[in-house]
Design a protein with these regions (language model features):
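Hydrophobic alpha-helical segments at protein termini of multi-pass membrane proteins
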Residues: 1-238
Length: 238
């Protein structure tokens, strides 16, 4: 028998590692640890909140309950996953930052958004890994792809959220981008995987998985650039 704490640890460690990573990136002017813990724990609440958005969409038929076609896969990816999940995260981020006196630098928006996003990803990972017969395989694949994906969506959300906060003249545009950019990237990520599930073509599956791998590299590169632009010493470059 495998001790329960092993699957649990394997599910949580990727999120913890990325939380430490973003904290280290902000080491020149770090946020209070208790604030980051609060943001991460509140991020966990974005899972039930996202279900409050996705369930009605499924109930009225906008999001199919099962996927049979490419169209179904795309609708589930964008409307059943990316839209409700990123909306829920943005709402939690707004709660965290609306009266936060520590939100005084552009990098802070990224740090808090990543904490919220990894709170979501941590619980989601636990739900996927715990109880799965192949928990080691699931934990490994999600540690490489899914959790870093949520990290990247959080970086972009925080990047634009900070611009909206510190550039009042373009607030509406940047706030719109704070939700549009994560939804598009999250939707593309899920759509590729969901299309692989429904296709019967082995060649298409291979091509899509190659595209998926390249897209994951693109995601990480984009997130890394966003972090560099918002680091305190680089503010003038944005």
């Amino acid at each position: 028998l495998i001790p329960m704490y092993l699957p649990l640890l394997s599910a949580l460690i990727p999120a913890i590692v990325l939380l430490v990573y973003i904290y280290w990136q902000d080491r020149q002017s770090p946020e209070p640890v208790w604030q980051l813990i609060k943001a991460t724990l509140l991020g966990v609440l974005s899972i039930p909140l996202s279900l409050c958005i996705s369930s009605p969409l499924q109930a009225i038929g906008i999001v199919p309950e099962e996927m049979f076609t490419f169209g179904d896969a795309i609708r589930v990816a964008f409307l059943g996953a990316a839209l409700p999940e990123e909306l829920a995260k943005l709402f939690i981020l707004w709660l965290v930052l609306r009266k936060n006196r520590f939100f005084d630098e552009r990098m802070d928006g990224i740090v808090y958004a990543v904490c919220v996003s990894l709170g979501f990803a941590g619980l989601e990972n636990v739900l996927y890994v715990i109880g799965d017969a192949d928990w080691m395989g699931v934990a490994l694949s999600r540690a490489i792809f899914a959790v870093p994906g949520h990290f990247c969506y959080g970086v972009l959300m925080g990047y634009f959220y900070s611009l909206a906060h510190f550039c009042p003249s373009k607030r509406s545009y940047y706030m719109a981008m704070a939700i549009i950019a994560p939804i598009i990237l999250h939707g593309i990520y899920d759509a590729i995987l969901f299309i692989v599930r429904v296709t019967i073509s082995e060649w298409l599956s291979v091509i899509l998985m190659l595209i998926f791998t390249l897209f994951c590299f693109y995601l990480w590169k984009t997130a890394s650039k966003a972090i560099k632009k918002h680091l305190p010493s680089r503010d003038a470059m944005v």
